Curated annotation (Swiss-Prot):
This is Cytidine monophosphate-N-acetylneuraminic acid hydroxylase. Belongs to the CMP-Neu5Ac hydroxylase family. One of its GO terms (biological process) is N-acetylneuraminate metabolic process. One of its GO terms (cellular component) is cytoplasm. It catalyses: CMP-N-acetyl-beta-neuraminate + 2 Fe(II)-[cytochrome b5] + O2 + 2 H(+) = CMP-N-glycoloyl-beta-neuraminate + 2 Fe(III)-[cytochrome b5] + H2O. Pfam families: Lactamase_B_3 (PF13483), Rieske (PF00355). Pathway: Amino-sugar metabolism; N-acetylneuraminate metabolism. It comes from Pan paniscus (Pygmy chimpanzee). Its cofactor is [2Fe-2S] cluster. CDD domains: Rieske_CMP_Neu5Ac_hydrolase_N.
Amino acid sequence: QTTEILLCLSPVEVASLKEGINFFRNKSTGKDYILYKNKSRLRACKNMCKHQGGLFIKDIEDLAGRSVRCTKHNWKLDVSTMKYINPPESFCQDELVVEMDENNRLLLLELNPPNPWDLQPRSPEELAFGEVQITYLTHACMDLKLGDKRMVFDPWLIGPAFARGWWLLHEPPSDWLERLCQADLIYISHLHSDHLSYPTLKKLAGRRPDIPIYVGNTERPVFWNLNQSGVQLTNINVVPFGIWQQVDKNLRFMILMDGVHPEMDTCIIVEYKGHKILNTVDCTRPNGGRLPMKVALMMSDFAGGASGFPMTFSGGKFTEEWKAQFIKTERKKLLNYKARLVKNLQPRIYCPFAGYFVESHPSDKYIKETNTKNDPNELNNLIKKNSDVITWTPRPGATLDLGRMLKDPTDSKGIIEPPEGTKIYKDSWDFEPYLEILNAAVGDEIFLHSSWIKEYFTWAGFKDYNLVVRMIETDEDFNPFPGGYDYLVDFLDLSFPKERPQREHPYEEIHSRVDVIRHVVKNGLLWDELYIGFQTRLQRDPDIYHHLFWNHFQIKLPLTPPNWKSFLMCCEQNGPGILQFSTERTNEPNRNKFSVENKA
């Protein structure tokens, strides 16, 4: 490890430290830090939110003077414990080492391990024209020609992602399947269905089931649901983080984890003849913010909008005006963050991608109109304004010749656009086959027995948390589904009460389209299908993000689905065993009463 001095305070500055929170900036680097003093004890950290790198300021609501608030998303950090308190029970802040030197100066130190990509370094060799070519297919899918090898990133080329919420914005080149079949290896960054697309992989597996696919060794396996998917792939390789994987004498790659979501998200460095290509994909803080500088090509997401917040929320502050202003502000923050990241890393070329999706199903017209995305050209213009980085806004089928661009960025053959008349944007989507799969779950025998509710949430395994959730099945327009289920779950003791308990408790209402929620329940899928796919409408009181709850249902559900076969056998043996739910609505907001009769 190397030790880096981040900040040095003089004896006078040390003597003037006040009890509680102290903010400092290193004027030479422009970096900000927080020191917390409790009598003789000092703790310190970077003034950077772990979520998306926002700056902390004093939390005026904290009378004890121990917490700071992020200016981006209002996350709160208790600096006395270095634990985040909003969202509750979520992350811990990385602490810095505090030392006094022989001159009574206070030093803030960071211990840095060596960068794994610097091990066994290679000097860049000159590339022949056409030797390295990067072709954009759609969304996050790139086709890389690296000498005599071909590598593909994140192939989502047909069908929806996140149940039925996302559809491709760009029309993939007509030869996309041939390109996949010709690949020597495929990298899939994480398990979200706009990167791990089973409809796409099913097409590929029909012709090349043994194609080598590489994924990182995440806590939640990328292919956790492979057996249930029915897709026959026989050559999936799970590789450790931070270690070069040699493909041939000229080509190697290294997978790195995300600093915010290490349990599921990854990014990749591909190196050919010493030239690095960095693809940070969807990582919030790729590799904890430590990334190679001056790579040949960097690509990352840019668009925003990959969340149900705030479009799917209502009640309280969530007016249309508030949502519109929030979305506008957040998109601008994301643009500035990406531009700053590119400026700091100084790649020769930057490409915004992994944000080209659209909410094209007619039932999601509101989301499509509300959930505005960043314009890649606006980001590229911002980057060019502040740096000498070359930018590339890709179009389906466009090819970047890395050798040409590195030698002469003005070379007219450096980027070959698709032929004139090529269809760029999709104007039709084959909805029906995918909606039929979802609709098949609605009439499944499981849901004739309302005891499925207890069975499912017991299987899910989330409990001992003070939260009450009301789950309501709805139609396309989020009106109550005729004959659908409407019930309470108390996660403190995992009970299903008739009405909300009298104790103080946070409360959420989750309205879910019946086809998607039943498909998710039946197959034991993660709730990203619901939340990121815009298939819910939510209300919460108080307005707090319950990280433990959402993180569990979005990433920590069991790896195998509920045993519904056994469940149905028990139902047959025990008679109806059905909990009958009826809803008596009161005039009190969020105080809906339930009549529950156990007929077992």
